UniProtKB/Swiss-Prot annotation:
A Pfam family annotated for this UniProt entry: Hormone_6
InterPro entries the record matches: Cystine-knot_cytokine, Glyco_hormone
Record-level GO cellular component terms: extracellular space; follicle-stimulating hormone complex
PANTHER family, sorted: GLYCOPROTEIN HORMONE ALPHA CHAIN, GLYCOPROTEIN HORMONES ALPHA CHAIN
One of the record's GO molecular function terms: follicle-stimulating hormone activity
Family: Belongs to the glycoprotein hormones subunit alpha family.
PROSITE patterns (UniProt xref): GLYCO_HORMONE_ALPHA_1, GLYCO_HORMONE_ALPHA_2, GLYCO_HORMONE_ALPHA_3
Protein's UniProt keywords contain Oxidoreductase: no
The protein, known as: Glycoprotein hormones alpha chain
Record key words, sorted: Disulfide bond, Glycoprotein, Hormone, Secreted
Cystine pairings recorded for this chain: 11-35, 14-64, 32-83, 36-85, 63-88
One GO-annotated biological process of the protein: thyroid hormone generation
Organism: Muraenesox cinereus
Superkingdom to which the source organism belongs: Eukaryota
């Protein structure tokens, strides 16, 4: 996907950033932040005909997410040591 200044609309690129709210001086917490890609466009007529609930606008997006996700005692632990643009969590179902 495009990841240039024009498509981000002035938003910083996807990267790790120190989370000041959760971090402690001896234990910094890092979080993936920034923009990747999103766009919206009119839904093509042939696509609307196949939709259960037709919609006029179609959107595509990728979000800035942690590259690594591991399990710890059946609890999801997101290791934010590296970030990349991927499917937005709220689009996964």
């Amino acid at each position: 996907y495009p990841n240039n200044e024009i498509s981000r609309g002035g938003c910083d690129e996807c990267r790790l950033k120190d989370n000041k709210f959760f971090s402690k001086p001896s234990a910094p917490i890092f979080q993936c932040v920034g923009c990747c890609f999103s766009r919206a466009y009119p839904t093509p007529l042939r696509s609307k005909k196949t939709m259960l609930v037709p919609k006029d606008i179609t959107s595509e997006a990728t979000c800035c997410v942690a590259r690594e996700v591991t399990k710890l005692d059946n609890m999801k632990l997101e290791n934010h040591t590296d970030c990349h643009c991927s499917t937005c969590y709220y689009h996964k179902s």
